[in-house]
């Protein structure tokens, strides 16, 4: 799926979520409204989308046994397949985290981790525990970025970026969803049902 379609889909989903939440809040009775959560905002709608993909990616990463973290489809030598040079599962996860930092730091202005040099993530982050920590920290930056969004600043282009704050926020989500789909295939190639797809019998 092309990045622009992913971005558009995430943006539509976020706007739909905000609209639905606003509609629900509007029809609540006065006592119910007082007892309910605060009215949704642009920031909370984007934050909800980040939370959704964060859970799926983290659960999928945690589901892969550590001894399979360096798995790549190239090792299967599938007939008719061409997986030469594709990322290992570990690097897929680190790529999501690295991209989260690169994308969302454009909104927050946070300094990148000293050991983050490229899109494949730090070379010294190797164990499953280290990779999951790196991943969690990258999503924490996403939540920080979402919290800064307002209707007034969402179309501003921060710093040296050519993209608006809103596009950066939603593109981070779209990019993570793209690579989550690849993580799912890696899990299934190893006989593991992704947590988000499991039933009670799994």
Locate the predicted segments by residue.
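Short, contiguous alpha-helical
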Residues: 47, 51-58, 70-119, 157-202
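Bacterial N-terminal signal peptides that target proteins for export
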Residues: 1-8
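Acidic/histidine-rich, surface-exposed loop or edge segments in extracytoplasmic proteins
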Residues: 31-42, 110-124
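Acidic/histidine-rich alpha-helical segments that form the ligand environment
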Residues: 49, 122-156, 164-177
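Short N-terminal segments immediately surrounding and downstream of signal-peptide cleavage
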Residues: 22-53
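N-terminal signal peptide c-region/cleavage motif recognized by signal peptidases
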Residues: 14-16
């Amino acid at each position: 799926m092309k990045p622009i379609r992913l971005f558009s889909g995430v943006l539509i989903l976020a706007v739909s979520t905000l609209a639905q939440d606003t509609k629900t809040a509007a029809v609540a009775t006065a006592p119910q409204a007082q007892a309910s959560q605060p009215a949704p905002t642009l920031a909370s709608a984007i934050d909800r989308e980040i939370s959704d993909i964060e859970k799926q990616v983290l659960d999928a990463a945690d589901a892969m046994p550590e001894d399979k973290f360096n798995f790549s489809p190239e090792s299967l030598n599938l007939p008719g397949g061409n997986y030469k040079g594709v990322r290992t599962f570990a690097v897929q996860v680190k790529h999501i985290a690295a991209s989260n930092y690169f994308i969302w730091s454009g909104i927050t202005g946070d300094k990148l981790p000293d050991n983050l040099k490229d899109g494949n993530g730090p070379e010294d982050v190797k164990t499953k525990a280290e990779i999951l920590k790196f991943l969690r920290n990258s999503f924490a930056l996403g939540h920080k970025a979402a919290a800064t969004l307002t209707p007034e600043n969402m179309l501003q282009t921060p710093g040296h970026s050519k993209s608006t704050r809103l596009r950066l926020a939603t593109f981070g989500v779209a990019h993570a969803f793209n690579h989550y789909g690849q993580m799912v295939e890696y899990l299934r190639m190893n006989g593991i049902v992704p947590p988000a797809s499991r039933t009670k019998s799994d």
